[in-house]
Amino acid sequence: MQKSFLLFLALSFIQCKTENYPITGTITLPFKTGEKYLSVTESDYQYSYHFIPLETKEESLLSKIFCIKRYNNYLYIHSLFNKSVMIFSDSGKFIKKIPIGRGPGEIMDPLYITIDEQNKQLEILDFFRQIKKYTLEGDYIASQPCCTSSEFEKLGNNYLFHSFTAQNSKNYFTVQSTNKETKSYLDSDKTKKPPLMAYSHLFKTDNTIYFHTDFNNIVYSISINNLTPKPYATLINQCTAKRINSLPVSKIDDFCMGEKLYINMLNFNVLHNGSTIYAEMITENNVETFLYDTDTQTTYLVDN
C-alpha cells in the first residue's frame, strides 16, 4: 500500500512538472513542398517551438484571431471577437489595447492592420474609412481618411486597397497617395479574375502584392510597380492532415475564419483546427511562425 502511494505521488509530480513547464518541444507539421504549392499531407518535417504565454488580464482577453503581425519585438494581434487590436511583447507581456470608440485615437470595428516599416508605425483601418496611426507602442499619432473600407497595405507613402464594383462586377486595386488616387482593374478574363465579392486577403513582400480569394482558390501576384495581376498558384481544395492535437483539418480557407484552412506557399500559411491556429509568415529572407491556442490564450513561436 505504501509503495502504491509513493508511486502515485511520483506520477503526480511528473505530470505536474510536465504541465507547468512546457518550454520546448518538437512537432510534426503536415506540410510537403510541391512545385507551386504546399501539399497538406502527413510528412516528417520537424520544427522546434517555444511557448509565448500571453499575459492574461481583463483588458487583454481575446479570441478569434484574425491577424498576427510581428515587428520590432512586438506582437500585434487583431481580434475579431471583441473587435480590438492588442499589443504584446514577443515574450507575451501585455503592452496595450487600442481604445475602442469614436474619439481621437480610438477605433471602431477595425478591418485590417498593417505596419508602416518606413515610418515605424502601426496603422489600423476602421469601419468608418479612417486610417489611425500609432507608435509601435500604441500611442496615437494621427488619422487619415481613405477611399474605401477594405483590405489594405502600406507601400512607402502610398496605400493599396482591394475593392470591387457591384455595377460591372469588376475587382480593382486603388492606390491612394497624398495628392492623387488611381485605380487599376483586374484582367476581365473570367478564367483569371476572382469573382465578385470573393473574400480575399493581401500579403506584401518588398516588390510584390499577393492576394487570394476563398471562392476559386487562386493566388494572384501583382507587381507593386505596375499592378499587373496574374495567377500565381492554385490551392488545394480538400485535405486530411492532422494537427498536433490529432484533430482533423478540413477545407481550405483564410486565417482562422471557421474550421478551415488556407495555404499560400509564398507568403502566408494558416492552419486552423478548432481553437488552434498555425500561422506562418514567409518572406524571401525571413520565416515567422506562430501557433495560437484560443483556449489557453497561448501563442507559440515556432523556429525552423
Predicted regions and their residues:
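Sec-dependent N-terminal signal peptides
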Residues: S4-S12
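Positively charged n-region of N-terminal signal peptides that target proteins for export
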Residues: M1-S4, K17
